[in-house]
């Protein structure tokens, strides 16, 4: 098993051997097993030397046409539709660019689920067969990409990187925050009202509480 093999490899390094951790394609440990071996190496005071190489995540991002200053990588989504949509719903308000891997036999369903959850106009970049002869990278809306997959403008072959535009950040004005807090304060204690207002508006609880105190003194 993984723990036993990790121990064996660590012992071989301690005994003077050199171990290289590689993958079939791309950069090792990016959506691949093996991080426990690296962790064990650090715990045993063994030097870890990374060798830069190609990564589908970074390669696709660099050519995506979407913001690259802030992004999150979520690997493969669940193969089960209900679990997949539930997970996507947790990312509705995520403002960072979203990066996923997807298999060809699930790509159409995944794009359709993303369209249902994020809306048809959210932009997405589909990248497949990266660095290969039939590489294809397409930037469009989720609804347009869905159609292009159906009519095979985007070929459903090879592994896919799916990059989704983050949600637009919206800021709630102080006036709106105070209004929400005032309504809640009619039935709840100041601290409870501030806590709920924080969850509704995204404003920090302490800031809401202080704003309410100042408003009450005017």
Residue ranges and their predicted role:
Residues 1-50:
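Class I S-adenosyl-L-methionine
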Residues 5, 26, 33, 56, ...:
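Helical mechanochemical/support elements of P-loop NTPase systems and associated helical scaffolds
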Residues 7-10, 88-89, 182:
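Short hydrophobic/charged patches on amphipathic alpha-helices used for structural packing
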Residues 14-18, 97, 104-218:
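A contiguous loop/helix-start segment that scaffolds small-molecule binding in enzyme catalytic cores
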Residues 21, 73, 103:
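Conserved RecA-like P-loop NTPase ATPase core
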Residues 23, 50-53, 100, 126:
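General beta-strand structural signal in soluble alpha/beta enzymes
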Residues 28, 55-58, 132-133:
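Short gly/pro/ser/thr-enriched loop/turn and capping motifs at secondary-structure boundaries
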Residues 36-94:
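Class I SAM-dependent methyltransferase SAM-binding "motif I" and its flanking Rossmann-like core
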């Amino acid at each position: 098993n993984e723990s036993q093999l990790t121990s064996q490899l660590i012992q071989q390094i301690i005994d003077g051997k050199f171990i290289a951790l590689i993958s079939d394609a791309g950069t090792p440990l990016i959506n691949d097993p093996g991080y426990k071996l690296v962790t064990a190496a650090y715990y045993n005071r063994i030097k870890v030397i990374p060798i830069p190489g190609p990564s589908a995540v970074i390669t696709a991002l660099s050519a995506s046409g979407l913001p690259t200053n802030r992004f999150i990588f979520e690997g493969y989504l669940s193969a089960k539709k209900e679990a997949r949509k539930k997970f996507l719903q947790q990312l509705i308000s995520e403002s960072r660019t979203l990066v996923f891997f997807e298999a060809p036999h699930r790509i159409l369903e995944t794009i359709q689920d993303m369209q249902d959850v994020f809306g048809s106009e959210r932009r997405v970049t589909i990248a497949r067969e990266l660095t290969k002869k039939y590489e294809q990278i397409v930037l469009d809306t989720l609804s347009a990409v869905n159609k292009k997959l159906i009519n095979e403008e985007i070929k459903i072959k090879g592994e896919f990187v799916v990059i989704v535009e983050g949600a637009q950040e919206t800021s709630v004005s102080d006036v709106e925050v105070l209004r929400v807090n005032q309504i809640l304060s009619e039935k709840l204690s100041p601290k409870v009202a501030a806590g709920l207002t924080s969850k509704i508006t995204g404003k920090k609880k302490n800031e809401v509480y202080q704003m309410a105190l100042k408003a009450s003194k005017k």
